[in-house]
Amino acid sequence: MKPEYLSIILVEPQGPINIGSVCRAMMNFGVTKLRLVNPTKHYKSLLAKKMALTAFTVLENALIFEDLQSALSDIQVAFGTTRRFGKYRKNFFTPADAAQKLNDAYQDVRSALVLGPEDTGLETKDLDLCQHFITIPTHDGYPSMNLSHAL
């Protein structure tokens, strides 16, 4: 998968520290396209800048959307992240399997990784807009991950 074809979409990210951390993680892997859906009004604060460091350019160039459907309008395939196994969601990828799928089947396709709010994750209506689902195996006693760590 070519990094220039991949967008990271954060749905209603709440904390500028997490947003800055996501920018830094993105730059570590050459991914520079960030889309924010209804972010906190302080998403470009000094805290975000401190966490992003030189990756703050990712945040400065981020596209802002009111809803996920708009953010996905030019995306051909979306991978939604979730820790919840719904009754109709059957095909989950691990991060490694999702990376392999992106590399094998979607190399020249505009793709997105979609992550939800820190406190609730993606809602069903948002997951319904995604073609694939990713879940990260974690300890049953504490399955929720920090936004930047999930990325």
Which residue ranges define each predicted feature?
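Post-transcriptional modification and biogenesis factors for structured RNAs
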Residues: 1-151
